């Protein structure tokens, strides 16, 4: 049985200056670079996460302990009526794996997408075995495989996934893979 999820507050962190946030993102990038060829690493660094189209969020306990991070990037996608977002930089702190924190972060990102009227949220993750838990996690949360979106190109090291944003004004069916 998994431990009960800790009491968590998920909030927007616009400056990305906290040492623990930087360390978790650096570990995330190091893992991505260790398991994927350079041309297939699509994780964003700190500077890229400061893009105005990106809303970066943190999950913390009441005492301020960092449990995870994630971001929502609003895409300029004229083919998606109602708007399109991308989940980026989802990472759970090692001490919070399998506690429900990732689900809480993802729910917060989907709520942000809904509040902004986005119809669809997509993501890119790896095809390597290292990423199998991530693919299962996203599938449990309603994501299905799709083709490349936004600026992505077909890549044998990438898996693209998408889902409609429930409750948005326009939430069409998933595009074909």
Mark where each language-model region is.
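Acetyl-CoA-dependent GNAT
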Residues: 5-88, 93, 106-108, 112, ...
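Internal catalytic or translocation cores that form aromatic/hydrophobic pockets or channels
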Residues: 144-148, 155-157
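Residues forming the Rossmann-fold NAD(P)(H) cofactor-binding site
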Residues: 99, 103, 107
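Conserved active-site tyrosine of GNAT-family acetyltransferases
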Residues: 138, 143
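Active-site acidic-Proline motif in GNAT/NAT acetyltransferases
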Residues: 93-95, 99
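Conserved beta-strand-loop-alpha-helix junction that forms the acyl-donor binding cleft
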Residues: 94, 123-134, 152-156
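Conserved GNAT acetyl-CoA-binding A-motif
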Residues: 113-126
């Amino acid at each position: 049985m998994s431990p009960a999820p800790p009491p968590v507050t998920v909030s927007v962190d616009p400056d990305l200056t906290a040492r623990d946030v930087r360390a978790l993102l650096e570990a995330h990038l190091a893992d991505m670079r260790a398991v994927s060829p350079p041309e297939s690493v699509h994780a964003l660094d700190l500077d890229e996460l400061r893009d105005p189209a990106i809303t970066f969020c943190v999950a913390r306990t009441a005492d301020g302990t960092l449990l995870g991070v994630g971001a929502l990037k609003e895409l300029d996608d004229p083919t998606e009526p109602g708007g399109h977002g991308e989940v980026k930089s989802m990472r759970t702190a090692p001490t919070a794996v399998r506690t429900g924190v990732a689900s809480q972060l993802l729910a917060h990102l989907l709520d942000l997408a809904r509040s902004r009227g986005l119809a669809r949220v997509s993501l890119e993750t790896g095809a390597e075995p290292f990423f199998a838990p991530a693919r299962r996690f996203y599938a449990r949360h309603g994501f299905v495989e799709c083709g490349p979106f936004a600026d992505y190109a077909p890549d044998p090291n990438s898996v693209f996934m998408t889902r409609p944003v429930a409750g948005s004004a326009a939430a069409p069916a998933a595009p074909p893979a």
